[in-house]
Amino acid sequence: MAEHTDQNLLHQVIYSVFVRNHTKEGTFRALEGDLDRLKGLGADIIWLMPIHPIGSEGRKGTLGSPYAIQDYRGINPEYGTREDFIHLVDAIHARGMKCIIDVVYNHTSPDSVLAHTHPEWFFHDEQGRPSRHVADWWDVVDLDYTHKELWRYQIDTLKMWAEIVDGFRCDVASSVPLDFWTAARQEVETVRPGCIWLAESVHGLHVLGLRKMGAYCATDTELYRAFD
């Protein structure tokens, strides 16, 4: 655990919600109608899987994966509007629960906002094409965190969302430099004191495989320094 982790988090119950599948309507407004039940189950923290627009290029299936994000600063219109999202978070807070959202900072969809505006911020293969380190993830391209301008953009984005939500669940956190997460945590704290940071770590064999390819990947014993 990070040096400043709130020990009360050890006793908190986190309930993960995939907005698309949680209700028949698959919207923020419809999810509000189920919050009392989730509270009754003992949930303390509602973790929303990615709420952002999904890319079209290379999409898996008809609907696409929510982890192939097209715009980190946007809201998936299938779920509702930004105002609907804020209304949902307010409703979660009104019931004494907290809300965290998924952030997917290892990769974006191939047709993402960043792919169009900053193609230099991405990992490229030997042919100079935007690519990925995990072959099966063909609906995404990996970001390259050797670019400090990318750090600034991502941290500013986290600070933007931290004005609304209580924390973040960080997808494939192991593949994003630990120094980035440490810097992000420090800056976000100025916006959301006590912000919750939950990391997805990966199996040791996955770490080893990526490192053999020359890619960055942190172990559990490294990640704990930046996450709760």
Region roles according to the model:
Residues 18, 166-169:
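Glycine- and acidic
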Residues 43, 165-167, 213-215:
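A structural motif
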Residues 156, 171-228:
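Active-site-proximal helices and loops of the catalytic beta/alpha 8
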Residues 47, 100, 169-174:
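Conserved beta-strand positions in the central sheet of alpha/beta enzyme cores
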Residues 98, 167, 196:
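Hydrophobic "anchor" residues on beta-strands that sit immediately upstream
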